A protein has these predicted regions:
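C-terminal coupling/interaction segments
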Residues: 255-293
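ABC-family P-loop ATPase nucleotide-binding domain
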Residues: 1-10, 291-293
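ABC transporter nucleotide-binding domains
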Residues: 4, 11-182, 187-188, 192-201, ...
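Hydrophobic side chains in well-ordered alpha-helices
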Residues: 72, 210, 233-234, 260-264
Length: 293
């Protein structure tokens, strides 16, 4: 069952096209991750699905409704990059206040437990660590007992332990049948959490699929070497080839690495420091986004 979707959604800000006719959908119990460099359109997609902005063309739907309608809003929880709450209120006061906005909120104790806030209920928000503050913002996103969570870079700036702790709570929400739209800069995060990944580049979908499918979409193998050949010469050797530079090294992503290596040696007998490895998700992501820029 589709919970939320964008259909041929386009959004412009003056001369800038933030989204150019994209399609995406989130099913019940699914975590969809949006990846992309700054300016790729991730936050714009989030704003459309939350009803904070309206597409110039196409449609945004949550539970089959306009996301600005009350029924859609009360079934949606959000944790945004710009989220701020008063630092002089206690954790329990924030949760109680936000819960009052919803018709069927989670019980207070369940919200605290689901966000990992046990023992912090009486603490002033301003006295919390960065990781604890993110847990509170996550609690405010789930306290209304939503069917879908929209999380815009929820672990940005957190240390590894805090990040992994929040991952556990997100996984628990999905395991209970919730749906999640997650934007992130952390490739490891998408790899660990997402059922499906969409890579955005300049407002368009550059790739979509599971983590393994994204790696295959970019290339099966990474060839790293020092060569005198230019990018244009390398790309012309085979189909589905991406190139990027790392200092004196050239990194080539190719689905047929054997053919590519033979071609490199044929055109540049002086090539050296050759290494062929499997492409990871981060490398696939870079190859896709740089290849579409």
């Amino acid at each position: 069952m589709v919970i939320a979707e964008l259909r041929n959604a386009t959004k412009r800000f003056g001369p800038v096209t933030a989204l150019a006719g994209i399609d995406l959908e989130i099913a019940r119990g699914q975590l969809l991750a949006l990846l992309g460099p700054n300016g790729a359109g991730k936050t714009t997609a989030v704003r459309l699905l939350l009803g904070l902005a309206k597409p110039d063309s196409g449609a945004a739907r949550v539970f089959g409704r306009d996301p600005r309608e009350r029924d859609a809003r009360t079934r949606t929880g959000a944790m945004l990059q710009v989220g701020r709450v008063p630092e002089t209120l206690r954790v329990c006061e924030h949760i109680q206040l936000f819960s009052s906005y919803y018709p069927k909120p989670l019980p207070f104790a369940e919200t605290v437990r689901a966000a990992g806030l046990e023992g912090l209920e009486r603490r002033l928000f301003g006295r919390l660590s960065s990781g604890q503050k993110q847990k509170v913002l996550f609690a405010l996103a789930i306290c209304g007992n939503p069917d879908i969570l929209v999380l815009d870079e929820p672990t940005a700036g957190l240390d590894v332990d805090s990040r992994r702790g929040l991952w556990r709570h997100i996984r628990s929400f999905v395991a209970r049948g919730g749906s999640v739209l997650l934007t992130t800069h952390y490739l490891e995060e998408a790899d660990a959490l997402a059922d499906r990944i969409i890579v955005l580049s300049e407002g368009r979908i550059a790739a979509a699929g599971t983590s393994s499918e994204i790696r295959q979409r970019a290339a099966a193998r990474k060839i790293r070497c020092i060569t005198s050949l230019g990018d244009t010469e390398i790309v012309a050797m085979a189909e589905r080839v991406s190139v990027r530079r790392d200092g004196v090294f050239t990194e080539i992503f190719a689905s047929d690495s054997d053919r590519m290596v033979r071609g490199l040696f044929a055109q540049d007998p002086g090539m050296h420091d050759l290494e062929v490895t499997s492409a990871g998700l981060e490398e696939a992501f870079l190859a896709i986004t740089e290849g579409n820029s």
